[in-house]
């Protein structure tokens, strides 16, 4: 967060009229600090988090109708929730309501899961069998927009009690070794490209190019973005970073009002909203005890107070070289 504050001051000084598109995580905390330091910043956040369910639904449409060529963008949605933990309460294709179709799939595959590539989740933390999505939908009546691992991380330990529990839901945790391998692979690819290898043609993992094109006057775009809540999600705290659709056009980003989350989904979300607020307050007041309280209040926290205190101290010790700001 101190780095975000530094970026914010530099943007205000060098290019105050620029549009800033944040892809950094944690999305909500980064955006909150950026706006706190430079309130007039033209800021929005975007990621590929919400692609997971739309891609699943596009596949379902093709399978159920016996057609091909339905893309993620062909699935129209109403999106609402906090950044990183958003939901769809409306999904359509060509004007047809797809919620009944989704319910049929959820009921049929709630136990076995619905897999594109059998057992891929065992080696790829970004793959899953959609069992968590189906379970949350059948219990809460609303579709998680994110992949199963991400959705599970925002819930109590229903799905994440241990690796055996996660495996039973057919998803895997994100491990340090996996992240290191991905980083190493990407670093090797970048070096090859810098040495003259031709860049491959590939589909971008976010809609950033389309967003930039729309902001520059290249046509209107509806895209999922993160923005401070100004009423677009009625029953989430004012100012918290929320994720909804937005109409993006020349020099303009206008959030689409998503409405209200069902109370059960809102209850899961509000806890995270206030925890994120506490983490930012810890930065502002340079008080790591405030962050500790947010750590204790995370839904996946199952440790007793003594064990949690020891774990927190161990975490701080491991990253102490990055915490000099809090010692000033």
Can you name each region flagged by the protein language model?
Residues 1-38:
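Rossmann-fold NAD(P)-binding glycine/threonine-rich loop
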Residues 18, 41-42, 75:
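A structural micro-motif
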Residues 20-24, 45-46, 79, 224:
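A structural signal for short, well-ordered beta-strand segments and their strand-loop junctions
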Residues 28-31, 53, 231-234:
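Flexible loop/turn segments at secondary-structure boundaries
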Residues 36-41, 64, 95:
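A glycine- and small-aliphatic-rich helix-loop capping segment at beta-alpha/alpha-beta transitions
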Residues 39-57:
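Acidic, His- and aromatic-enriched active-site or binding-groove loops in soluble protein domains
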Residues 65-328:
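Long, compositionally biased stretches enriched for glycine and/or charged residues
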């Amino acid at each position: 967060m101190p780095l975000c504050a530094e970026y914010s001051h530099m943007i205000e000084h060098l290019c105050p009229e620029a549009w800033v598109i944040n892809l950094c995580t944690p999305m909500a905390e980064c955006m909150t600090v950026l706006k706190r330091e430079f309130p007039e910043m033209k800021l929005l956040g975007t990621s590929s988090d919400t692609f997971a369910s739309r891609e699943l639904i596009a596949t379902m449409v093709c399978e159920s109708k016996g057609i091909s060529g339905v893309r993620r963008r062909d699935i129209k949605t109403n999106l609402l929730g906090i950044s990183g933990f958003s939901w769809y309460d409306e999904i359509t294709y060509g004007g047809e309501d797809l919620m009944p179709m989704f319910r049929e799939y959820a009921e049929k595959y709630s136990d076995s899961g619905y897999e594109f590539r059998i057992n891929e989740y065992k080696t790829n933390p970004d793959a899953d069998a959609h069992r968590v999505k189906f379970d949350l939908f059948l219990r809460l009546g609303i579709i998680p927009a994110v992949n199963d691992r991400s959705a599970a991380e925002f819930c109590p330990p229903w799905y994440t009690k241990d690796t055996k529990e996660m495996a039973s839901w057919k998803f895997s945790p994100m491990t340090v070794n996996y992240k290191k391998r991905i980083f190493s692979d990407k670093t090797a690819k970048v070096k090859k490209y810098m040495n003259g290898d031709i860049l491959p043609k590939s589909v971008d993992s976010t809609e950033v190019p389309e967003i930039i094109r729309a902001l520059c006057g290249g046509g209107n775009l509806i895209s999922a973005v993160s923005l401070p809540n100004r009423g677009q999600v009625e029953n989430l705290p004012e100012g918290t970073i929320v994720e909804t659709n937005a109409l993006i056009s020349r020099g303009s980003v206008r959030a689409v009002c998503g409405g209200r989350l069902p109370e059960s989904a809102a209850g899961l979300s509000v806890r995270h909203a206030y925890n994120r607020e506490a983490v930012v307050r810890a930065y502002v007041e340079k008080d790591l005890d405030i962050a500790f309280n947010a750590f204790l209040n995370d839904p996946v926290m199952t440790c007793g107070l003594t064990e949690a205190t020891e774990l927190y101290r161990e975490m701080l010790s491991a990253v102490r070289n990055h915490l000099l700001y809090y010692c000033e």
